């Protein structure tokens, strides 16, 4: 009798796909998908509650009944004016900026397989801030719809410089190399922006709070002008979950599974540039939101980017609004800028990650 031949060993990509889809190509259990979808609903509910707190709390607290009256039947009173012209635009800006930074951080960490990837740590926000500073200090541009293009250019330039420096040499673009390159690039860009502002005291007075990261004094016009860029970046980024899942297996495995590797990388870079440029143009450079939130999300939902990306986009504005409200409450009648509060919250998380050595590539 002829002996049976040993089956051909499966490739790592096939094993990964089989593990993800089940033994016979079946999709993951519906129960887990339903639970994750329910978690998204919970996150959305938390965001609504935090948005209500952001509108009601501040230098002077306003009852929710007054907030509802201001929304449904404004009468021109001081409380209604503050709510409609200051707090609602500020809250909407916090939601947009938080979603943009959270999604940008998740995209960067997935694409580079670098757990330290963050728009602030990799110098992307500082590049966008330098672009805005150039627009204001040298060209006198004050329209957000105009200087946002300078923010996009600065963010793209920072991305190219950081990746070029971090990937130089035989070892390639490792997490630590990229982080060091990003920190160095961010410091150079920050120094350049500071030098420009020192040359123009009037511009410095206008931008000194913005440079620390602030949601104060947004206008409805600013939101309208920047919202299309944020919306485009959010829509594009959320569509990249499946190809990024495939790329997490490696470029060769991704190609074998039908992923257009170059196109996915380019689209991810475009999404990150749109998100970071618009967020920085609106609120200044903010640190740690894009670093801490994706890590917390992956601890809950796992590594599937189809869930990591939307969860990050919902959880990050919750953190940002919480930091903003806290900054307003602890320094009444003034406030502590949200950039300072985010750093105060995010820095301990970063230190804890480093001490536990959770810095392996994703």
Predicted stretch roles:
Residues 1-362:
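Alpha-helical transmembrane segments in inner-membrane proteins
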